[in-house]
Amino acid sequence: MKRLLPFLLIAPLLAEPGDKVYQKGFLSKEDSHKSIELQDDYSFELVLSDPHIHEPVAMAWDGNGALYVVEMRTYMQDADANGEQEATSRISRHEDTTGDGVYDKHTVFIDNLLLPRMVLPLDDRIMVGITNTLDLWTYRDSDGDGVADEKVKVYEGGNRGGNMEHQPSGLVWNLDNSINITYENKAYRFTDEKLEVQKLPRGGGQWGIGMDDAGRNYYSAAGGERPAFYFQQPIKYGALDLRGQEADGFRVVFPIADVPDVQGGPRRVNARGGLNNFTGCAGQGIYRGDRLPADLKGNLIIPEPVGRLIRRAKVTRENGKTVLSNVYPGTEFIRTRDINFRPLWATTSPDGAMMVIDMHRGIIQQGNWTRPKSYLRGVIDKWDIDKNIQKGRIYRLTHPTFKADKQPRMLDESTAELVAHLAHPNGWWRDTAQKLIILRKDRDTVVPALEKLARSHSSELGRLHALWTLEGMSKLTPGLVSFALADQSSLVRTNAVRLSEPFLADGNQDVIETLGSTPALVEDIEMVIQTINSIGASGSDDPKLIAVIDALLERHGENETVGAIKNLQGSVVASRAEARVQKRLGAAFGKAMEHGKV
């Protein structure tokens, strides 16, 4: 069922002879809300808006459910981007004190920032990244007034040049305890209170990073018109895309806002005057909650701010390959005719729902592309949208069956109490508990409880997070990894292979022999793919592991993903036999040198 109030009854209009009817200025909050069309009895609830937030672009919750909103208050305040580089933006903090789901207590947590772009709540600190620098800072409110009063630089990355739309975003604490960002070929990791850098084979993405329950990330690129990519495997093993990973026609969009303000110009405008292809895709997120209809779980939600729409993509994983398809062929999950609806962030919330940021403004393209005489400048001037600024909305996606979960109080709980949340059906709770345990000073006290959970809990996701929590604490044992390699769950087994990498690198024979003799490795294609990746990543040339690789390639070499990984990691996998020959030749050459024969 669609829900739409006839737009022409509510919009401020200006008729132009011989031309279409244009919306001018802003709709009221009520009318803008009513104009949003949603599928399948879903609806939006407005939980936070201006005047409490202005120009919101990202958000995240701390362990007690306080919401931190990143506000780029100087972004495109006119068509020439005047004043954009002034340090007057902020990160605000919001609480729901009544339990009704609406945020009613508001403070400015950090003020006078230069276009903040990343926020990651840690324990009682939040980590922040801003524009034009790769430095990262943590902020803390030490006196409980909702305003940060302590600031510590945790990473010195130096200046970062380039257009503000093409600088890193993210700061996503991943399942594997890496903290991922876009663009840069690196990730971060907390080890004993120090933020360390991990090199990656490639960077990617633009605004936001999604993550599924298996720890695979979903990147997007507005400039590249790519709604999702690099989601076939963790990017540490290489940036892998497969042919056909998007269903036919997936990039075609179906807006009802017929506004041609697209940077790609007329080629990206349909016959009605609206967007015809993904272009502004940003802030995508996998729904990992437990309070909305079950068929939404695992779907990728992709905001498209240029099209004033949100795509719901079904994520299908078969034979080691992920494919995305539009759940609603020929239409969209969420869309509106309100020209100021600019969705650009979607994420699972602590209450089990999903929250969406609507930046709610006229211009959604940085000034480099809106210069005088440009195509976009002509559209901006004709529609008079440069004056539509300093608003912002956050919506909760809800459903008649929705019943909100309790508010979290994890920052107040003991480390022992946090362990149970690792098996929570909502991914936000699991991720947050894992992060908090790793950051706690008394984390070693819960090692026995984590090991028990990893071995015997009925929830495969609980076992999975217990294993990765131990890994983040440097308390994972080879015995537990060997045990997990035989888990009844393919998801747990596959991650156990990932977790085995340091033990493979160290030549731990118990783990090596267990991996090679695991019955599931014969037919579990997910485990096969991960084993090929992990042996390669370990750098081991143990003959037993080489035999495992050879056997897997012989048995599964025709699998599309296995073939792609073989090509991607040719120096590790496809050329392994040649490398062994070269190694033997090198050794022989060295001995010959010693004996004066060459």
Label every PLM stretch briefly:
Residues 405-408, 430-442, 461-475, 480-486, ...:
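Structural detector for internal amphipathic alpha-helices that build alpha-solenoid repeat scaffolds
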Residues 1-7:
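Sec-dependent signal peptide recognition
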Residues 193, 331, 374-382, 515-518, ...:
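Short beta-alpha connecting loops at secondary-structure transitions
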Residues 548-549, 580-586:
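Alpha-helical repeat scaffolds
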Residues 16-417, 428, 436-439:
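Beta-propeller domains with acidic blade repeats across secreted/periplasmic ectodomains
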Residues 414, 446-447, 510-519, 545-551:
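HEAT/HEAT-like alpha-solenoid repeats
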Residues 425-426, 458-459, 488-489, 522-524, ...:
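Short inter-helical turns and helix N-cap capping residues of alpha-solenoid HEAT/ARM repeat scaffolds
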Residues 7-15:
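Hydrophobic h-region of N-terminal signal peptides that target proteins for export
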